[in-house]
């Protein structure tokens, strides 16, 4: 099992995800989106694992202006704009190989063990 958690250090759900894997003795790699961000390859792989980049968008993101711009763009521009503005991601994004989840999803992670 190769768990990656993408999130921010201040996100409550990201902290809960880290605690979930720590309590079960499962090793994971934490990637802070504010410090490092997601590479284009990681973004594409995560989007594929989730069934589309649309699932990464947090409709409650604080950056309302960029969120509104994302809605106004044509489909082929939206994916690139989201990649450029990773503060719009819903977190945590948890990846296990070709599987992935967005948000706190322990019922799905349980099946990964």
Please identify what each model-predicted range represents.
Residues 1-24, 28-33:
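Local sequence-structure signature of Cys/Sec-based thiol-disulfide redox active-site neighborhoods
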Residues 33-113:
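Thiol/selenol-based redox catalytic cores and closely related redox-interacting motifs
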């Amino acid at each position: 099992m190769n768990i990656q958690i993408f999130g921010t250090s201040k996100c409550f759900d990201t902290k809960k995800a880290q605690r979930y894997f720590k309590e079960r003795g499962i090793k994971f790699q934490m990637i802070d989106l504010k410090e490092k961000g997601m590479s284009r390859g990681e973004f594409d792989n995560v989007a594929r694992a989730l069934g589309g980049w649309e699932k990464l968008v947090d409709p409650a993101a604080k950056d309302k202006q960029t969120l509104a711009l994302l809605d106004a763009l044509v489909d082929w521009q939206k994916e690139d704009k989201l990649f450029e503005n990773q503060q719009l991601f819903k977190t945590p994004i948890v990846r296990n190989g070709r599987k992935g989840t967005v948000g706190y999803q322990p019922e799905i992670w349980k099946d990964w063990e």
